[in-house]
Structure formats: C-alpha cells, structure tokens
Amino acid sequence: MSWYFFICFGGMFITHNGIIKAADEPILTAQNRSFKYGDGLFETLKVHQGSVMLASLHFERLFSGLLLLGIAATDDVTASLLEEQIKELCTLNRCAALARVRLTVYREEDDKAGYVIEAVPLHPEENKWNEEGWTADIYPYARKSCDVFARLKSTNHLPYVAAQLYAQEKGIDECLLLNNHNRICDGSRTNIFLVNKEKFYTPALYEGCVDGVMRRYLMDALKQRGFVVVQTEVNEALLQQSEECFLTNAIRGIRWIRSFREKQYSCTNTKTIYKEIIAPLYLKTED
C-alpha cells in the first residue's frame, strides 16, 4: 500500500504528551494558552531514512526557548525521549524514509510543557536542487521587533503567515520580512544569505531574524571551509548589489533566488554549497 493511499484514506496518527492518538482526535481545550495567546514554540524537523536531521541543533534551540519563556520541561520532555517518539511516529505513519515533522510545545496551566508531534510524508523533490530558482520580494505590511523573542520559533507566527499568503497572491516564491529599522531580517519560512565579493552575508540575530537551524549549520560549515561569513545589518541596497542570494531552512535545505524584483542573481557558489554541504546531509548519492 502506497503512502499516498494511506494519507488519502485516513489512518494518520499524532503523539500528544507521549500518547499516540488518531490525528483527527480532539486534544486541546479552549483554554489552551498556545491556542489563545501563541504561548508556545515549535520545531519543523526533517526525518530521512529514520534519522532526525540536525536533531541536536533543533533541541538546543527548543530548550533554550522554553527556558526563556519560563515553560518547565519535565523529566518526560527530554531531547532523547522526543527524538525517539518522533521516530516511532514516523514509522507508524509510514513516512520514516522522508518526513516533515512538526513538534509543538506549549504552556500547560501549571507552566509545564505539553507537546504535540505531527509527521507526514515529504516529497523527494524537497531534497533536490531548485534548478529554476525562486523569485522574492519584500512583505510591506509588517515589521519585526528586534527583541529577545524575535529569534524564537513561536506559535505566535502571524507576520510569517501573512507574508506567505502575500507571496501566494503575488505569484512569487518567498517574501522577505523587515525589522523595525526597515532592514531585512528573514523570509516567511527561511533565513537569507547573500554572496558578494566572495563573502557571505546574513542578518545578525540582533536584527530580529529567527535563529534558524540550517542557518547555524551552514555558517559553521562555511567557516570550517575557510569562507568569510558576516552576520550584519542587511538592507535593500546590499540585496541589490550582491551577486547571489539564497535561502535556507531545515526542510528544503537551500533554495537559490533567481530574482528579487528586477534584480537577477547567479547561483555558481550557491550550487557548490548545495552539492558539498547540503546534499550530503540527505542524499546517499547525487545525480
């Protein structure tokens, strides 16, 4: 039985506070703080051949965020237990070969952590190089604040959701968000990198971007290979003068930008990064 048949005709499961339940079973009350206030965090993880990719970076970010929010992770909410439950759920949902997993952690009434794990099959195309390149623009209707919460993957995700809808309406692939200084901080579902004169530029965390897992992984990998990576303030002028522009996240890895408005980019360095750094994470062999 194919996973396509399995998905279409039901039978999917989730994990709620360590307990396997049917995906369509109600699990939250109207008093849930994540539902009412966005009082929680989430991680979007990629599972490949039964392994949770970049798991240590995901859980480091998650537990750091819970500490900041004052949400207590009890003994049954640990990185090792969550990782094991993610793997079990992927197996149960028949998507351990390649899956998108969402782990949502929210504040219970006693300030302890409650959580939900969802796992669905991921199309193999998500592993591949985006040959045609993406198009991008700036989302004009929101500004992110540059506070300590800006770097979190918060369930209060409204500016990003609105930016994704705006991109769909405009027929473009991604929208970039500005901070309250009118500088670029990140994309609606990505972090942004620019390549200019053999240097890599990305918005610093103090600029309000999400502390992306693939962003961190790639910066370390580039530095280990001797490249200069500059975390700085990124304005539209730098975007216009750069030779290459690409986006990163944990699911798609890397996506090169073909155009930003009238600006056209090349992808020579970006494709090399994909082949040498990103693809080996997910692919046993390369085309």
Model features per residue range: what roles?
Residues 5-88, 106-108, 112-287:
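Helix-start/capping segments and mature chain N-termini
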Residues 90-99, 226-227:
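Short secondary-structure junctions
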Residues 95-105, 112:
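Ordered, amphipathic secondary-structure segments that act as subunit-interaction surfaces
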